[in-house]
Amino acid sequence: MKDINNIDFSIIRERALRNIREDLIAEWSHEFPADEIGEAFDYVLKLHRDGATLDHFIPVLVEAEMSARLRSGNLWPATAA
């Protein structure tokens, strides 16, 4: 019997981040180049990873920030540059 308490959540987080990236590109590539969305995603992900005390919520935070940037029409706000 497998120990259900021995779960590697980092794999789950990485899969979630990959899916979020792919979904954002699919949804917004008609307004922004896919590579630009990917670069902004990587930047936002790095910001959250560098500042995280607990990494469990990084996918949710990255998705929320990227969605806000995409909706605003500005992937690179002046405060982020």
How should each PLM-predicted stretch be described?
Residues 2-81:
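Charged, amphipathic alpha-helical regulatory modules used
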